[in-house]
């Protein structure tokens, strides 16, 4: 048997994260894509870290296309007028639990949106089931909201609009260190958190709604090796996932 080369010892290797994707190659949006992607991540427990009690995960998440059918329905209930498909962008926010700080952050974001020449449409509190979480995840759980921004008529759909949203996000990040923008785009949205693999589906009500339809879904289960788990550090990271 050959010995170790240098300082490398294969016995000290660690597992890394789990990743997966589901794509409808014809571009047809269905809820089946959401369900299949969630099923993938639920089968990646061997690629997902958790605490010693086995009740809090290192992080699990999913990236999806924005489902106009779904958001038109839920925004109508909130009296948020989002317009036609791809005529708006959505931000997913992890706000502080403290109400005063949260309201200050929201006001700051709305001010920056107006400063950049865009119109803010409204806020939606994301419905969640925090009772499925382990104590550690629940104790540091953020206040999760979605913010809606109208696409200006002089800005093209897709990448051009996303570039303007990117500038807004970067400016906001310089002004607020206590709020984390999970995603901000006119095309995609990220749902993630400090979950076990089976908690992503049950935590977010949005993911269980048959009207949430997408042609693309990417999932990630995190296995922390050199950084502590947190809500922010869960993947996907707005555009990509990686397994270390």
What are these regions (language model features)?
Residues 1-243:
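N-terminal segments that mediate ammonia production and transfer
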